[in-house]
Amino acid sequence: MESGKSPLEENLQEFTLKEDSELRFEVANGDVMLELVDGRAEVFGTELIQHKKYVFPAGSRVAVFTWKKAVVELVGKTESAYVAEQTPMIIYLNTHAALEQLREHAESVVMQQEQARGPSLMIVGPTDVGKTTVCRILCNYAVRVGRTPIFVDLDVGQGSISVPGTVGALYIEKTADVVEGFDKKAPLVYHFGNLSPGSNIPLYDLLVKQLAEAISKRRKSSQDATYGGVIINTCGWVKGEGYACLVNAAEEFEVDVVIVLDHERLYNELQRDLPSFVKILHQPKSGGVENRSKEVRISSRNAFVHKYFYGTRAMPLYPHTFELSFDEVQFCKIGCERLPIECLPFGMKVDDHRTKVVPIEPSEDLVHHLVSLSMCTAVDQSVLTTNVMGFIVITAVDMEREKLTVLSPQPYPLPSKILILSEVTFIDDKERT
């Protein structure tokens, strides 16, 4: 005899959360719907609205936290779902309060001190300690007290502002959507073209410097940005050259505060190597953070690129596929083969080959590669330090007809003819008519 319940209703779970506790759940296959039935609660710093239904797709990992108490319902199949009574949220709230004090101090001394500005905070730590989540919480808390912080993501492998292989910044004017995250309508994005800083450290350091300078100009031109401060996410590579990249980023962004998540050695090394005026804090990671396998990381990157072109079920996008003639575009890449010292042009440094912009000819090797659309009008060194306007994927190359087929967020023609090759690939498996 049938129960008469839908498959979703068969999987209904209700949780009563005590003060300072959180419900942690991971979505299995299919969707899970979250509803706040009673009380007050938040997801990564964004408040939930009572009786609004939030639908999370497969693979989502979510923490629903309450400062007082709450009753929440989950409908759908979860991989896991449990209530944790020990969380680091009070630590993150205290961090937010300290940052807000620094913002208020900057406002109060602006009449006497022209250089007063809100805090620049950098969050560091190895992979899988929850750096991106802490950034999201602190940005959301800042917005909830009327601030407009700038969020910077220097993680080229698992970034949350744009597609993999980029660094970028986002002006945060409203709290993140509970399911979709921050509004990414107008990010400032630079092309790196690889998934690890180690593939081209001179280029990575140069882009960090460029991004820091662009943000400094933005802060000088806007009072809200000046006082709102900067919150910086970083890569999980914390040893050797990766550590040097972190120190360089701290210097370029002139950070005031560094939070080290769950890594005592890194905390001690930064205490030794950063200026004494930088406040360095060691904080625990959340117990809800789990180590991600290589396969999960690859899947996460592919999902991010897929979302860029296709959106989500709640907010779908409809990309375009069309052909381009070879002569309609100019391809280039950053970095070339190292020449022997005796063959270098006069004045060129040995490292310069890593940051040289070189034109390339279309070939079948381009298939499945992401390509950045530069705002430049010619292939020259300005491509290196100019932000990009968007991305396409090369889905086919016909050498006989001299035609490319591309997946693009907008219809023909492309807004730029200067295309920068990325080593990041994406296989578009959607069939469109």
From Swiss-Prot:
GO terms for biological process: mRNA 3'-end processing; tRNA splicing, via endonucleolytic cleavage and ligation. It is found in: Nucleus. It comes from the Eukaryota. Gene3D superfamilies: Clp1, DNA binding domain, P-loop containing nucleotide triphosphate hydrolases, Pre-mRNA cleavage complex subunit Clp1, C-terminal domain. It holds the Pfam family Clp1. One of its GO terms (cellular component) is mRNA cleavage factor complex. Its main location: nucleus. InterPro entries: Clp1 (IPR028606), Clp1/Grc3 (IPR045116), Clp1_C (IPR010655), Clp1_C_sf (IPR038238), Clp1_N (IPR032324), Clp1_N_sf (IPR038239), CLP1_P (IPR032319), P-loop_NTPase (IPR027417). GO terms for molecular function: ATP binding; ATP-dependent polyribonucleotide 5'-hydroxyl-kinase activity. ATP binds at residues 22, 61, 128-133. Keywords: ATP-binding, mRNA processing, Nucleotide-binding, Nucleus. Belongs to the Clp1 family. Clp1 subfamily. Required for endonucleolytic cleavage during polyadenylation-dependent pre-mRNA 3'-end formation. HAMAP family: Clp1. This is Protein CLP1 homolog.
